[in-house]
Amino acid sequence: MKKILIKILHFIKRILTGLKNHCLPSSNPPPLLLSPYEMYVKEEIKKCYENFKPHFQKSIFLNHKDYHKFIIERAKENDEFNKKFYLEFGVWVGTTINLFSKYVNTIYGFDSFQGLKEDWQGHVLPKGSFNLNKKLPKLNNNVIPVVGWVQDTLVPFLENNKPEINFVHMDMDTYETTKFVLTKIKPYIVKNCIIAFDELYNFSGWEVGEYKALKETFNDNEYRYVCFCLNGEQAAIQII
């Protein structure tokens, strides 16, 4: 009799459990749908991967710290007499330019210190982001700041110095300003020059930013990729 009662109780329990699952709301909320922006980012990263995949096997991947060390050391290999020019566009708080300055005699940093000149389209930052209200950060002694909008300062600098440009760290973020800089400096760039982009790939809007400016200024046969940052958006090319 006891065994029969136990079977009956188990049977009733299964019925009640079934009724609960069908009639009562689930205690687990349904999975959230991706927002349009999240879907956009996901598709951008996938498209970015397919675009850069052919270059990955011919380049190296480094973490953020080693990436910056690699690009400046690679540029130094092309400057036997330490007479070539090293430029950074987009200084902001001076972190990278101070790092690069430890490897070279002089490095020039172009920045208005008033933030982005235009909206960062395809991404999340509006005009004016990174604004320091014209206040310069602490810079090493061999860092020479070129203060003002690059559209006003770059051409006079090039005309006055006739530089042999061996290294460019491009951190202007947006397409318009990056395109302006690349177009103006291209005639002064030497063979094997390293151009490092701080936001070239691996983020939403990559295709309409620095990458677009690069593709419109240089032909594919004029450069090769040498390094990608494995945990960031940075990538570097070397002029052939």
Positions of the model-derived regions?
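Active-site rim elements
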Residues: 55-60, 201, 205
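S-adenosylmethionine/decaboxylated-SAM
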Residues: 80-240
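Membrane-proximal basic amphipathic "stem/tether" segments
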Residues: 1-59
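Short secondary-structure transition/capping motifs
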Residues: 60-64, 89
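A broad, low-specificity signal for short, low-complexity segments enriched in glycine/proline
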Residues: 45-50, 65-71, 157-159, 201
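Conserved alpha-helix/loop element of class I SAM-dependent methyltransferases that forms part
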Residues: 65-83
